[in-house]
């Protein structure tokens, strides 16, 4: 179990500023984790489905770390969207904790330090055509929901400073989950690749027997006009389409958690949460484990991927995504987090994120498509979601 005594006197801001590429960083509303070095690497599985044996491979890595002298080992890293792709998980050599980030000043709007060449993949019109394909599969009854995403490929003449980018993300998103994880290929000649972002969505947290999940579905872009901003929030909360989209996700999360829980509290209706750029419909689902040996990773594996990032039915939606989207999602819409040898852990949905490699960045954003969705609206929603990363980079618009 995570011992609250390991929450040190170190200020969270110090851990943020100590982060360097190659380390693991996760700031949640409750704590900050900085992990460095590699004691053990969780190996890839031999079979096609990497998730099937992931819990066992993590348990073995933790056991090896204990034999090496670690008293309270934990695993950190990221799991991709596609279950046939390998996760990037390690037992770090050094782990430091603190309380949550609490900035005593508001950061000024970030100015762009680089000039970027930006290429959308797919092009906006092609993305809208993809939404039409998704709507056709909904209309013929194949799917009830599909989440379709697009990407921005940014290149710069200068190396990407991921440590600076992480600090900007954290200062603008202190109420969510800011993360950075090394997802480099294990081949020695490969360049370093870093997954970083600021997600508002908790896939699952397990502390002792207490379980929490916070699915989000249904959203609106924020407005700089306070009156218009509140109008959009109220409209979202009363939108039949968005309430239906949210109910599909919340019901699926509850159904996945129920077999593990002695009790489960599911809100009758969603509430609103906000980030700097978006309004979201949110349901905080809380439960108590019936079997205390079930780990945070096992719960996360049962939930991943939720309809919030994939669709329903899950397998058919995943197949449609692979057919419609012209790129590999990588770790986008996967999960990032940690799990210790007692089973405690936090796993975050990897949205509002990018993968950085040398002088390039790949940003990702998706939108849920259900009956009644309009392609232009979904395009605008993805544009709004890109703003989390773009603002941290000092890019006003694309």
Curated annotation (Swiss-Prot):
Gene3D superfamilies: Anthranilate synthase. This is Isochorismate synthase DhbC. InterPro entries: ADC_synthase, Chorismate_C, IsoChor_synthase. Signal peptide: none annotated. Pfam families: Chorismate_bind. SUPFAM superfamilies: ADC synthase (SSF56322). One of its GO terms (molecular function) is isochorismate synthase activity. It comes from Bacillus subtilis (strain 168). Belongs to the isochorismate synthase family. It catalyses: chorismate = isochorismate. Its EC number is 5.4.4.2. One of its GO terms (biological process) is biosynthetic process. It comes from the Bacteria. Pathway: Siderophore biosynthesis; bacillibactin biosynthesis. Disulfide bonds: none annotated. The modification Phosphoserine is found at residue 271. It is an enzyme of class 5 (isomerase). Keywords: Isomerase, Phosphoprotein.
